[in-house]
Swiss-Prot record:
Regions annotated as coiled coil: 322-400
Function text: Microtubule-associated protein that is involved in the formation of parallel microtubule bundles linked by cross-bridges in the proximal axon. Required for the uniform orientation and maintenance of the parallel microtubule fascicles, which are important for efficient cargo delivery and trafficking in axons. Thereby also required for proper axon formation, the establishment of neuronal polarity and proper neuronal migration.
Annotated B30.2/SPRY domain residues: 526-747
Annotated organism of origin: Mus musculus
Annotated Zn(2+) binding sites: 227, 230, 249, 255
CDD domains named among the record's database cross-references: Bbox1_TRIM46_C-I, Bbox2_TRIM46_C-I, FN3, RING-HC_TRIM46_C-I, SPRY_PRY_TRIM46
Keyword Cytoplasm: yes
Localisation: Cell projection, Axon; Cytoplasm, Cytoskeleton
Name under which the protein is recorded: Tripartite motif-containing protein 46
Chain segments carrying region Required for microtubule association, proximal axon localization and axon formation: 411-429
Amino acid sequence: MAEGEDMQTFTSIMDALVRISTSMKNMEKELLCPVCQEMYKQPLVLPCTHNVCQACAREVLGQQGYIGHGGDPSSEPTSPASTPSTRSPRLSRRTLPKPDRLDRLLKSGFGTYPGRKRGALHPQTILFPCPACQGDVELGERGLSGLFRNLTLERVVERYRQSVSVGGAILCQLCKPPPLEATKGCTECRATFCNECFKLFHPWGTQKAQHEPTLPTLSFRPKGLMCPDHKEEVTHYCKTCQRLVCQLCRVRRTHSGHKITPVLSAYQALKDKLTKSLAYILGNQDTVQTQICELEETIRHTEVSGQQAKEEVSQLVRGLGAVLEEKRASLLQAIEECQQERLSRLSAQIHEHQSLLDGSGLVGYAQEVLKETDQPCFVQAAKQLHNRIARATEALQTFRPAASSSFRHCQLDVGREMKLLTELSFLRVPEAPVIDTQRTFAYDQIFLCWRLPPHSPPAWHYTVEFRRTDVPAQPGPTRWQRREEVRGTSALLENPDTGSVYVLRVRGCNKAGYGEYSEDVHLHTPPAPVLHFFLDGRWGASRERLAISKDQRAVRSIPGLPLLLAAERLLTGCHLSVDVVLGDVAVTQGRSYWACAVDPASYLVKVGVGLESKLQESFQGAPDVISPRYDPDSGHDSGAEDAAVEALPPFAFLTIGMGKILLGSGASSNAGLTGRDGPTASCTVPLPPRLGICLDYERGRVSFLDAVSFRGLLECPLDCSGPVCPAFCFIGGGAVQLQEPVGTKPERKVTIGGFAKLD
């Protein structure tokens, strides 16, 4: 039983040692210089926050052609970037060497930097190629002497060396052989001592007795960081430059306006941040291990996917080779057939010519026929023979080979195919689509249209994402609604919320994966449900002057002789003909919205709404011509001035003329066909591509909007005591086009009065 407990204890100890060893080996990677791949020796902090050994940095600068900026390795340090030399055992303390004369000569102008003329106005900027981030770091004109030593990293390296060293005791440097183990160190003397030697070399009552002993070490560092410019202890930290500064640096013009804080505050802030970050990492070790397992699984999948990709590419290339081989066989077969046909024709021609030789073939037969003396028999045989001889004679006189020996028509032009094969590469994901803002709009539904850039790889399908931007943001990442696998380059989003702002984006997908998202496009939905209706020209419309389209969604006023004949006085021009077109649907409750486009060349068009009864009464029984100052029952009789409460107007129109919107000083100027109180101060605004009309039946208000930006143009009161329907008035030439609904067209609503009530 005791043996089992001992074995368990031994196993736990060994496991702990293995974990410690693994931890130390993993930490060793952080303590290696990126240049020499050995543990840091006197590391310097580069402006990019990476570290490098001073000797390695000096060597790199020498390779770059910078001379006199690395400092003398044997010199005593005059700045934190310089490093003291380690004194050999049993040697007296060396005197301080002189500062680096070469660096002073270069600064004073007696020396020159490589590539810099003597007496140049601007000092040379030294670039150091950082081996960690692979970028050039500016060191300034001071070179390495302007950098700080990373004393903390030195201490970590020293502690690591002591923890992994076996029997690596530090010996006294002043003892006679054999030296004893060192117990103290002295930064001022830069040596390690045993107890006896420390007392011997630091006698009581002398200045050396004031030296503060430290732990024994082989690497002596300055007590603190010193400013490389003023040789003063750094006491502040410049947040703007992200650099430690001394009291003199703090008041210099270089740091004027910078955020400077005491080094204690910077120390505490950075320590708190580092502690919190480290605590978070240590508290989420399970998450780290889970992510490591996920990465390992990703590596396995990568290996499998890579092998599958290789096999797929090999199979496709073999398929191309098979197609090429098949094509090669068919082309060679065609050449072979052409060759055999030509050889056959040439062989037949040779046979014909051989028959023309003396004593053979046709010539020999003709010679024998000429020997015939019986005239009838000769004529019988010579007739056919003569024809053959004539053809042979003609062929002899116009000799030409029966077939050409050239096969130029069998040459292949493989330039295009070679270019395609040369450009054969892996399929790329589609580029970010471009939203077609001219064709994208929001009406009863949202219609989104896009296209791919000219040289983009093809997309098999698209993903459309959308969300509302006018709702409170939920905690966490932004949530998008998606429409997956959209075919084509357009999409419909049904039933959007009214009076909202939607942001939409789209991206393509093919076998290579998903591409980048398009730029976001923001669309405003109508402020109320869209009203679907058709144009009805039976009330107040002249068929001679108004032309309504077959789908009853467009109307055009045609000026001409009928318009002139409709006026009672042709010469004065004080009377004009007004033609009215109404919608076939009336509104009795709720809010409704519709949009239309007015031809900018229209002379005078009024777009709006009115009470159904008042519109029929006014225009069905009104004279054919009216004065521009005539108000067809605006709802105000001659006694309206004495009424306590002014009645609401039965009509509300927006006036458009010659590409401009005519706005009066108030809503009353557009409440009817004309102003009630005569001319008023008015202004004009440009006509937008589409006009929107929003009717609030309960509130008795109608708003005219820019249907593209939904910017308000005019808001008017309206008498909503009965059914209200859309109305369009024309004076002179003009045209109006109702906006087509994005969805399926609704069925026509037909009632006995020509109007359907929308309840």
